[in-house]
């Protein structure tokens, strides 16, 4: 359907308030509906209301905002918000990431990581990286070693995500054994890594 416009803060909040399960919510994630940093003013306003005493009075640690890394905007978010941060990496090698994600050409993953190293993620705020594992694309030992080198010194975690086949898309996911091997290698080399529970296979 493509991009149609950015939601104002009120509409972002209404997406939450209108959920039938709103009273049972424990966490909120800004992910999968466009790039939050491209609508930063409204995202910051919405998270401010969610965490303010006059709003929901939630702790910022119950909210995660995802980003591919947008120059200047990510820095502003890190300075003005205490919410958790999830960075969509998907490939640690810049030239390959640019093929998967054109945003790499704007603010590369190496620049993103260098920026993140200026902030403290050892206490309440958590930093995570999202990584969809594609067969024969980003699942090799070369990629695992590049991840370890790239995030060295960062207090972070990695979430490996299974890819489910999409019609007419040539990309493929890997089997469970490969996912576990990739996870174990990263974990053994100091990068805390989990495999996200899959809800999309059906």
Q: Regions from the language model: what does each represent?
A:
Residues 1-10:
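Canonical Radical SAM [4Fe-4S] cluster-binding loop centered on the CxxxCxxC motif
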Residues 11-189, 194:
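Conserved AdoMet/S-adenosylmethionine-binding subsite of the radical SAM
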Residues 200-202:
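Radical SAM enzyme core and accessory elements
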């Amino acid at each position: 359907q493509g991009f149609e416009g950015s939601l104002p803060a009120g509409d972002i909040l209404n997406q939450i308030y209108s959920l039938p399960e709103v009273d049972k919510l424990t966490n909120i994630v800004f992910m999968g509906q466009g790039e939050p940093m491209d609508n930063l003013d409204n995202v910051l306003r919405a998270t401010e209301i969610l965490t303010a005493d006059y709003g929901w009075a939630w702790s910022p640690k119950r909210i995660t905002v995802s980003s591919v890394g947008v120059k200047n905007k990510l820095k502003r978010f890190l300075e003005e918000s205490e919410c958790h941060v999830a960075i969509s990496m998907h490939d640690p090698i810049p030239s390959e990431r640019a093929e998967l994600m054109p945003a790499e050409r704007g603010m590369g993953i190496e620049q993103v990581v260098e920026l993140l190293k200026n902030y403290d993620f050892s206490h309440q705020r958590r930093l995570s990286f999202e990584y969809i594992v594609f067969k024969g694309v980003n699942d090799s030992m070369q990629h695992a070693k590049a991840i370890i080198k790239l995030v060295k010194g960062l207090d972070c975690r990695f979430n490996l995500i299974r890819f489910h086949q999409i019609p007419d898309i040539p990309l493929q996911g890997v089997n469970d054994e490969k996912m576990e091997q990739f996870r174990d290698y990263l974990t053994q080399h100091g990068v805390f890594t989990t495999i996200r529970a899959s809800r999309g296979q059906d």
